[in-house]
Regions:
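Structural motif
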Residues: 40-42, 64, 101-102
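Ligand-binding loop in jelly-roll beta-barrel domains
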Residues: 89-114
Length: 116
C-alpha cells in the first residue's frame, strides 16, 4: 500500500488562515501535513497584497521557503523567492507583504501570540 502524498503548491485550494482562532484578513492556507492539535507539520501559506501576520513568538524552530513574492519582516529584512528562512525558538516578530506571496512552511510546534 502506497502512503505517498503529492501536493502541487500552485494547484491547491486555500482556506482562511485561522491558526490563532479567527481568520487573519488576507491570509489563507492549505494544510499538507499540519496538525492543529500538535502545531507540527507542513502547510502552504498565501498572503494577499497588504496582509500582515500577528505578532508572535516561536516556541520551537520554524522554517519556510519563499515560493513566490516577497515578505517583509519586523526589522525590514525582505525575504524573496527562493529564500529559505529559519526562525529559532524564542524569536518574536510579525511579517507583512506589499504585493502578496506564497510560502511553504515547516512547523515544529505552535507559535504563541503576543499581545502588543
Amino acid at each position: 500500500m502506497n502512503k505517498r502524498k503529492i501536493t502541487n503548491p500552485f494547484n491547491v485550494k486555500f482556506k482562511p488562515f485561522n491558526n490563532y482562532g479567527s481568520p487573519i484578513p488576507g491570509m489563507s492556507w492549505h494544510k499538507i501535513t499540519y496538525s492543529e492539535k500538535t502545531g507540527q507539520g507542513t502547510y502552504l501559506l498565501k498572503m494577499s497584497p497588504g496582509a500582515k501576520s500577528k505578532f508572535h513568538k516561536h516556541t520551537n524552530f520554524e522554517e519556510f521557503v519563499m515560493l513566490e513574492g516577497e515578505l517583509i519582516d519586523l526589522d525590514n529584512k525582505i525575504f524573496k523567492k527562493g529564500d529559505v528562512v529559519t526562525f529559532k525558538p524564542g524569536s518574536k516578530h510579525f511579517s507583512y507583504t506589499k504585493n502578496g506571496c506564497l510560502i511553504l512552511v515547516f512547523m515544529r510546534s505552535r507559535n504563541k501570540l503576543i499581545n502588543k
